[in-house]
Amino acid sequence: MSNPSIFQNPKSGSIKVDGTFQVVDAEGKVIKTVTDPKLCGCGLSQDKPFCDKSHANYVSIVTRMLEDARANAKAVTPVGVWNMRAYEIRKRSLENRLAVGENLIGVKFGGALLKSDSVEKCYEGIFGFLTDAMQIETELNLGSLIAPLAEAEVVFKLAKDLDRSISLEEVFDFVSHIAPGIEVFDCRYGAIDPYIDDAIADNACAGAIAIGTWVEAKSHDLTASEISIFVNESLNQKVSTKAIAGNPWQAVVNASEKLANAGVVLPAGSIIFSGSATNGIAMQPGKYRVEITGVGEVSFEAK
């Protein structure tokens, strides 16, 4: 087709092309001649030369796909979620959880892989919602998860509503308590590092969480602490808490920015998981324990 005119609808993702072009097979044989086609940008009909209206139910379809993966503990293939719809899918998933009686208790912060031509992997911060149903008391059933990884983190409890982006100097005005935490990262796409839009749609791969005893935030120099993760009481990794964003308190600042951009307000008493200080540990049955010097520890049994 010569001199095509192309328009993409920013809301639906559909692409309107003015002109006539031919759809051919691998051998160059013409399958169909299409005039002024409307190409589907939703990602669900990539094998079709024209829009089949799939995008109308896109959010519901992908949300259900990810919810089924979680419920059945069976990985699904990433669909290459379109950016604007990723946020809608994350929100819809939370709404569905709340509709069945779960309660929102906070968010987890972490990094997601960006699409890039660079040899080195590039990541950007994202968040996922946490509900009370994700909290581990003493035991975790590994059979309910897909590709669980155990990560050592710091957990922050909010003293007041986090309703805007804050600075590092303001953190203690917003955080009342801290605790050691273990996040179980569980990607619904299996043991892969998903690209950012798929990761957002998957609620930042939130699986399960364990939280230790709360201590007052101002009474501990968190930047001078070390965080260790043990498997069956054998030390697996030990790092400075500065492995979290260069300063663990910065995790709250970063989270506040992402939440503000998304229009999300976390009420007082909510929690924020910092993002992992350690490399994720592929989980097998056994005891997992995280310790933060001067703060405390948390543990659970995986079966």
Language-model regions, residue ranges each:
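N-terminal pre-ligand scaffold of iron-sulfur
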Residues: M1-L44, K48, S60
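Short strand-turn-strand beta-turns centered on an Asx-Gly dipeptide
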Residues: A26-E27, V231-E233, S274, T293
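Short Cys/His-rich micro-motifs in 6-15 aa windows
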Residues: S54-S60
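Catalytic-core "active-site belt" of small-molecule-metabolizing enzymes
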Residues: V62-G246, K287-R289, E297-K303
